[in-house]
Amino acid sequence: MDSNIKPKILVDAVITWVDGSDKDLIKKKGEYLKSEKESKIQNVKTRYNQVGEIEFVIKSIIKFAPFINNIFIVTDGQSPKIIDESNSWRKEYRDKLKVIDHKVIFREFTGFLPTFNSTTIETMLHCIPNLSEHFIYFNDDMFLIKPTKISDWFKDGTPIVSGKWKKLPQKIWYYQLKYLLFPWTLKRAGFKYSQAHSAQIAGFKEKYFLTHHKPRPLLKSHFFNYISNEKKDLIDQIKYRFRNYKQYYSYSLVWHKAINNQSLILKENNDLLEIHRPHKIGFKKVISLLNKNESNNSVFALNIQSLDLVNSTDLKIILDWLKTKTKINLK
């Protein structure tokens, strides 16, 4: 894309990031985990460990989505190393990066900080100062691996969301039996369950649109219009410092409400390569999957989860692949 051509709409990127190895964060988190069960403590630990992936997330955005205006990094009093590195970048790239503290977006609700809950943090993203109406939300394990255009994310300003329709769990006999025999499983805040829960809040009674773990195109106005402005309702959502099954996914809730209002474009073809448990399948399989998708032009997004669990030798190979893929001259 010619950098001199002004896009029809401004699009920002938002990345939520935590340095799980930070001693102050570990201490702070430990104070709130004292009453938590050991199983949940382990779950929280792996969710927030990181191996420097955010460098490749940011560089992939700059390289493969040059239309992006600002790149907001939302974090808890931390700053990734790439911010220091960016001091040597050309101004046009350096000025894209903006670190936003949780206190800024939580505004009058800072009493619920610190929070270690991405579901809670996501609910407040629309409160980022100067955030564009159109933005794409990234987790720090989501990467772009091929060139993209605004039209891959928005059509005439309307978000384009890929996924597939699924029956609500309560409508499937297997889950009905499971919840009857093992009622405690209802209290697990799983990826699919939370999306189904979000759809039900939006009024869906039979099915929900299951989306993938990929960068998410969103409208700021959808958050303001579709997430309750009632203070009590918002507090009920953001009061949990760790994930809770009672919470909805804010992006899924606004998407389902947008579906009701015909202000969302759905597509069922997948443009994502998603790799789960790389520590289980081994680096050879991971690299094979990555290389295999090089020739698939429809796949432009990548998600690799739990890289912190990969052994150091395999991790270096995977990170080297990401480094090569996202290499760009920024100086």
Task: Please report, for each region that a protein language model flagged, where it lies by residue.
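Short amphipathic alpha-helices and their capping/turn segments at secondary-structure boundaries
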Residues: 1-16, 124-131
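Long, low-complexity C-terminal extensions of enzymes
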Residues: 10, 245, 249-331
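A solvent-exposed, charged loop/short amphipathic helix patch at secondary-structure junctions
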Residues: 10-12, 20-47, 163
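A conserved acidic beta->alpha catalytic loop
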Residues: 21-23, 76-82
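Active-site-proximal specificity loops/subdomain of glycosyltransferases
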Residues: 45, 49, 79-131
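Short, acidic, metal-binding catalytic loop of nucleotide-sugar glycosyltransferases
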Residues: 60-68
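GT-A fold catalytic core of metal-dependent nucleotide-sugar glycosyltransferases
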Residues: 79, 124-168
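Long, charge-rich alpha-helical interaction segments
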Residues: 160-241, 245
